[in-house]
Regions:
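Bulky hydrophobic/aromatic content
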Residues: 1-57
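Loop-centered beta-sheet repeat module
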Residues: 40-87, 94
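Well-ordered beta-strand positions in beta-sheet-rich domains
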Residues: 66-68, 93-98, 139, 170-172
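Short, charged/polar surface micro-motifs in flexible loops or helix N-caps
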Residues: 75, 79-81, 88-90, 107-111, ...
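Beta-strand-connecting loop/turn residues
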Residues: 79-80, 99, 109, 166-169
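Flexible linker/loop signature enriched in Pro/Ser/Thr and Pro/Gly
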Residues: 89-122
């Protein structure tokens, strides 16, 4: 939305940022503070396909470590901004919370992107749902009031809903086993 405002300051899009919001479905948490200077370096590196040297504090650690980082994309989830990236020369893709970067310095070296990497594919494969296993056959009993929500926004393309007892239905589908699925099921 910032892009739309800057491109069209006087036109129809100038008030776009005042009219669009993303609201989390979960309990709202206060977003973590992110160092503006660090973010500026990371965004610049991402836009220009350049590496940066990042000092990153992993969760549960007391001391940060420095890594050459190849930024591949940004994902915004529940008030937290994640950098999707590779570290050093390794091809494995990582998720790094921006607020955990303590320092960032631009490097004059192009990024190392895994062959065929696409951010949408990475997300659609469930990497942000914290995979725990393979696909499972899920079947659960739910009250009728859940039916409309699951018809409008199904769990998977092969989801089925069939009547059960008075006021209940059986929902079935084949879906990847993830922590996110467990959290969702526990929400009922």
């Amino acid at each position: 939305t910032r892009y739309c405002s800057s491109v069209n300051k006087q036109g129809e899009l100038s008030s776009w940022t005042d009219k669009v919001r993303v609201v989390p479905r979960t309990q709202r948490l206060i977003p973590p503070k992110i160092d503006e200077d660090v973010v500026a370096v990371i965004y610049d590196a991402l836009l220009n396909n350049r590496k940066f040297l990042g000092s990153y504090l992993k969760r549960g650690m007391r001391v940060s470590k420095e890594y050459p980082v190849s930024p591949l994309g940004l994902v915004f989830r529940d008030g937290v901004t994640y950098l999707v990236a590779t570290l050093r020369e390794y091809p494995d893709v990582r998720q790094m919370a921006l607020h955990r970067f303590r320092n960032a310095e631009r490097l004059d070296e192009g990024i190392k992107s895994p062959k065929g990497f696409k951010l949408d594919h990475y997300i659609n494969e469930g990497e942000f749902d914290y995979p725990e296993g393979d696909f499972i056959n899920l079947e659960f009993k739910a009250r009728n009031f859940v039916i409309q929500a699951l018809r409008e926004t199904p769990l998977s393309h092969n989801q089925g809903i069939r009547p059960f007892e008075e006021g209940w239905v059986i929902v079935s589908c084949r879906i990847k086993e993830t922590q996110q699925l467990r959290w969702w099921l526990l929400g009922f």
